[in-house]
Amino acid sequence: TDLAGELEPFKGYPILSGIFTQEGIRKLDQFMMEFGFLTKHKFSIRTAKKPPRGTPARDVYLIRSYEYPYEWDGLSEEEVQNRLVDIRVRLRRMGEQDGSMMVFSFWPDVIMIKEVGDPMEVADYLGLDRMGLKARVILAQGRQHTNYAITLYACHPFFLQGVSSMTNGENTAFGPIREFLSSRAFTGYMGYQSDSEVFTHILHYTTKRLGLGLDMYKHIITPLKDEELLRHPDSAYLRTLKHSLRSLIIDGPNCVIGALPDNTVFMAQDSKKLRPGV
């Protein structure tokens, strides 16, 4: 995020990031035209080189910015943001039906590139050192959750409405957390092909839905023990927060690194710090 280079002049326009077949691009163009989106800028990655060992051959790594539909003029910022999420989810579900597209993000000033394989070999294969591809805030993780089949939707980092995170750790409370988030009646709380995705969605729920700060995110996912809360100056408030949002407590050692819409970058860990950040 906070893009530079060739994409910097288009910060105010939503950027679609994903992997598409030629048929997927055809479907995308038809879909976006029906909604009134006009292509503003294309920065797609095509490579004629043989992919590295373990990396599937793809048609197009698509990065495309759009002008908003005229019909969206006058909409509130919240409504625009919710519509962007709805469009991304609809495109993702279209692609899941026939494998023609994988959509990772649709948001202003953000691109997401995901692939399977050796990180350095993939970076060289995709030419990620090209001059036009620059950003001031970059989250990169060379792993995905090992408890699930290899799928790009399960690869870190995860992103939702301007908040992003990547995780190293365990989350044995994945089931209850997923059920809680899925019941919040928000389109973006979906997918969950990795238990680490809930870290991003809890961050979104904390900051966007509850209007709380980053410090409260830490108290929600890894709250203090009851005896520690007794000594805290905000004891009553934090006890209420802990008990009312008990369903969002992460059970297991973890380290989370993420970014907020204002480009704040953070790291949060459980109390035992068994997953080092550095």
Where are these regions (language model features)?
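Conserved short alpha-helical segments that host acidic/polar catalytic motifs at enzyme active sites
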Residues: 1-278
